[in-house]
Amino acid sequence: KRNYLKSYVIGALVFFITQICLRLPLINNVMVKFDSFNIFKSFYPVAYIIFLGITAGVFEECGRYMGFKLTLKKHRRFGDGVAFALGHGGIEALLIAGISSLYNLIILLNLNLGNDNGTILGMDANEAMIAFNSVNNISVLTIGLERILAMVIHLGLTMIVLYGIKFSKKHYLLIAIALHAIVDVVVAFIGSIMGSLFWVEVWCLICAIIFIIITIKIKEIFYKEV
């Protein structure tokens, strides 16, 4: 019985390092200090969206590649890819949905304890109540669905990178970067143009189905090699 814990942990670390420690601070804290970048961001929104999508693809997919290439030399089976993707997508879900849930829990606990006079996370009691009431069953289900679809997409991208490494096909890294960028760019365009989460979810569902098919095909190839 194989132990997939290392693959899971490396997957989580890759997301944390590439996004939380590198890409986001670089964009939000370093590049914003340059006037040329702020002009680009303000006057060329379409190009900026494409830039964000490409950088997300480059950082995350190169991170996956380095993770398998350098630290998982003896952990390159199909199950390792699944574990890596679960760690990668899991830490993302924790940092995105988890923090939001914790935020709402703090508000709820303060309201239940009768904290009506002080502030709750910088808001007065009425503002906190409005913020908490804005969270409904539909929004919770939407977040849950979005995270599941994102996990499937992470799985597909991980398998593409792992397949490229295992079978010495370096161009598969470029394919993963391109697919990642396309997914993110279209999500941003749909969200900004249509302003509806419904169509964003539809697009993510389509992508998830495609990546499921890709994952199944790669699984068949992996098990033929066993």
Predicted regions and their residues:
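Hydrophobic alpha-helical segments at protein termini of multi-pass membrane proteins
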Residues: 1-226
